[in-house]
Amino acid sequence: MRIKICGITQPDQGQAIAQLGATALGFICVPQSPRYVTPDQIQGVITQLSISVDRIGVFANASLSQIEQVVQQTELTGVQLHGDESPQLCSEIKQRFNHLELIKAFRVKNLEALAQITAYFDRVDTLLLDAYHPQLLGGTGHTLNWDNLAHFNPPLPWFLAGGLTPDNIQEALTRLHPTGIDLSSGVERSPGDKDLTKVAQLLTQLQQFSSKKFP
């Protein structure tokens, strides 16, 4: 299972989280976000990494040129679109950056919103399902209605996000079967300041879950 910790801002925390067992780090490239980091800050984290992990830049309603500017200045391995990007724009971004993983995030408000995801199946590499919030794009601490996802079985890999914590991760994975999980506020002291104790607790919970599932 992929384990993505999003909203990394500090090099020492990025390195520690990778060492604890995360498989991906997310960097927020949305200037309005309290977790925003510049390309220089992103690269500052990446150069400190001694372990190979996926490095994902998170954008929301950014132009192709804005994404390109960040990609050219950093060693990202993937781009995540967390806004209202159309299937057509996703195709253009994938074509332009075909060497990078393209993740499309969806803030799922209801079953109707879930149905709209099908239009993206052949446009992106990976899906991410997050909780809906009328003002915030992510890191809300709100959980999804997991019941709505009971029959979600897309042909692509997908991350479950939205209010996940060390305390509820086992329940989430008992009820749903994502190929990855994405946490931000659930392992933070404050926006952008990760709580390494909580990250360690998360990995412990995942190990316990795995041993129960595959004794």
UniProtKB/Swiss-Prot annotation:
Write out the GO MF terms.
Answer: phosphoribosylanthranilate isomerase activity
Q: Name one GO biological process term.
A: L-tryptophan biosynthetic process
> Which reactions is this enzyme annotated as catalysing?
N-(5-phospho-beta-D-ribosyl)anthranilate = 1-(2-carboxyphenylamino)-1-deoxy-D-ribulose 5-phosphate
Keywords of this protein's UniProt record, alphabetized? Amino-acid biosynthesis, Aromatic amino acid biosynthesis, Isomerase, Tryptophan biosynthesis
Record keyword Amino-acid biosynthesis present: yes
Its annotated pathway reads: Amino-acid biosynthesis; L-tryptophan biosynthesis; L-tryptophan from chorismate: step 3/5
Top-rank lineage group of the source organism: Bacteria
Q: What Pfam families does the entry give?
A: PRAI
Q: Indicate the enzyme's highest-level EC class.
A: isomerase
Q: Return the EC number.
A: 5.3.1.24
Q: Does the keyword Amino-acid biosynthesis apply?
A: yes
Record InterPro entries: Aldolase_TIM, PRAI_dom, RibuloseP-bd_barrel, TrpF_fam
Name the family.
Belongs to the TrpF family.
Protein name from the UniProt record: N-(5'-phosphoribosyl)anthranilate isomerase
